[in-house]
Amino acid sequence: MRLATAANEAYTAPLAVSELLGCKQCGGGRDHDEELGIRIPRPLGQGPSRFIPEKEILQVGSEDAQMHALFADSFAALGRLDNITLVMVFHPQYLESFLKTQHYLLQMDGPLPLHYRHYIGIMAAARHQCSYLVNLHVNDFLHVGGDPKWLNGLENAPQKLQNLGELNKVLAHRPWLITKEHIEGLLKAEEHSWSLAELVHAVVLLTHYHSLASFTFGCGISPEIHCDGGHTFRPPSVSNYCICDITNGNHSVDEMPVNSAENVSVSDSFFEVEALMEKMRQLQECRDEEEASQEEMASRFEIEKRESMFVFSSDDDEVTPARDVSRHFEDTSYGYKDFSRHGMHVPTFRVQDYCWEDHGYSLVNRLYPDVGQLIDEKFHIAYNLTYNTMAMHKDVDTSMLRRAIWNYIHCMFGIRYDDYDYGEINQLLDRSFKVYIKTVVCTPEKVTKRMYESFWRQFKHSEKVHVNLLLIEARMQAELLYALRAITRYMT
């Protein structure tokens, strides 16, 4: 448990202890410090997300008793409530599983020492230029006794961690290229070799933070107050709210419209939702009437896989990584490339041959006990999570839509389900949504607020956060499948 030992350390947490216990006004003792001449940082920006109005997050967080308990547990474990946690407030069942899994990976007994875990988190987040996560884990790395020299660049870290850089690179951007030779190179590196258990722990951490970078960018997570870009020393503007309002129930605010795009007319919103629901009804009727042959199903997968290569955004420009992030990884020019372009041919990964439930789960649990179960629970919650709503409609079965989103992501990675009709994807996911999905999953550093607002314009922010949970868990599972299959092939 991390406890603040000095006044200035208390301010490094986005939510200080006094705030957690229910301060009624911003300050928590800060006014007294300002009288003493101490410069106190104030949040820069409007709430935990640049995409989601702060008032919506405040209202949800203050009305749910379960969230209060989760916040308290998270604060006790990490000494902070970060903005990712605050945005996940919309989905408490998932958040509980997420926090439990992350706590186990970072703090409970395991093959890797604590400072290695945070450094691997830094390496993984840096591949997507996610300074938000890098900054969080730099602080945690130092807190658990990590050597500050390692933070000057990957070349200053132990050779064992440097050797992990290649796997990190390929796993983050082109996981279909991972082979058993990558695994062998790490396990047989003489005095710098990894054990199988250590490697599985590292792989889980890498996939966790690659995916969390996707969530960070996909939801427009704002920098923490103690990080670069997250604070100012200027006097506050007139406002009645601070982050502590989440825990003390002080939310006497005007109701925010549930429509995430204010410029969309009510009639446009209505017809977009109705059109999507009608497509779902038609597809269900087609399922009941006829079933496509295996050959036709395979053909539709190949068509969707090829089409996914040509889904890109108009903002698809290269993003040059900043030095403070790029020093944590090598080969800065290496990034996502569609797996079938440039004459490359990669065999389709058939889930019937190697899947998480029958193969990956047991391998992880054998080498890193209990983690497989935690990850499996998180996958299932994200995949099955539903409130049976779509925008303004209730009592809607959204399973078809959730499956289309999950399988589209796996399709982009070359992963095929023999029992799924990939023709449904084009019926349910329009181009703007596909652009958002592909950007969040493959090049999250390029996500813009315009992309977030352009898909499902009539849906609530909570529903868009739900989409992001599906995206990150599907991505994590895809990466794990390729990495764990390579480990299995090495072992056999």
UniProtKB/Swiss-Prot annotation:
Domain statement: The N-terminal domain may have an alkylhydroperoxide reductase activity. The C-terminal domain mediates interaction with GATOR2 through which it regulates TORC1 signaling.
Top EC group: oxidoreductase
Task of the protein: Functions as an intracellular leucine sensor that negatively regulates the TORC1 signaling pathway through the GATOR complex. In absence of leucine, binds the GATOR subcomplex GATOR2 and prevents TORC1 signaling. Binding of leucine to SESN2 disrupts its interaction with GATOR2 thereby activating the TORC1 signaling pathway. This stress-inducible metabolic regulator may also play a role in protection against oxidative and genotoxic stresses.
GO molecular function: L-leucine binding; oxidoreductase activity, acting on peroxide as acceptor
Subcellular location: Nucleus; Cytoplasm
Enzyme Commission number(s): 1.11.1.-
Assembly with partners or alone: Interacts with the GATOR2 complex which is composed of MIOS, SEC13, SEH1L, WDR24 and WDR59; the interaction is negatively regulated by leucine. Interacts with RRAGA, RRAGB, RRAGC and RRAGD; may function as a guanine nucleotide dissociation inhibitor for RRAGs and regulate them. Interacts with KEAP1, RBX1 and SQSTM1; in the SQSTM1-dependent autophagic degradation of KEAP1. May interact with PRDX1.
Binding site for L-leucine: 386-389, 398, 463
One of the GO BP terms on file: cellular response to L-leucine
PTM-bearing positions, type Phosphoserine: 293, 314
Region (N-terminal domain): 71-252
Active-site positions on this chain: 130 (cysteine sulfenic acid (-soh) intermediate)
Keyword annotations: Cytoplasm, Nucleus, Oxidoreductase, Phosphoprotein
Organism, scientific name: Macaca fascicularis (Crab-eating macaque)
Gene3D superfamilies on file: AhpD-like
Region listing for C-terminal domain, in residue ranges: 321-492
Protein name: Sestrin-1
Family statement drawn from the similarity comment of this UniProt entry: Belongs to the sestrin family.
Main localisation: nucleus
GO cellular component, one term: nucleus
Catalysed reactions listed for this entry: a hydroperoxide + L-cysteinyl-[protein] = S-hydroxy-L-cysteinyl-[protein] + an alcohol
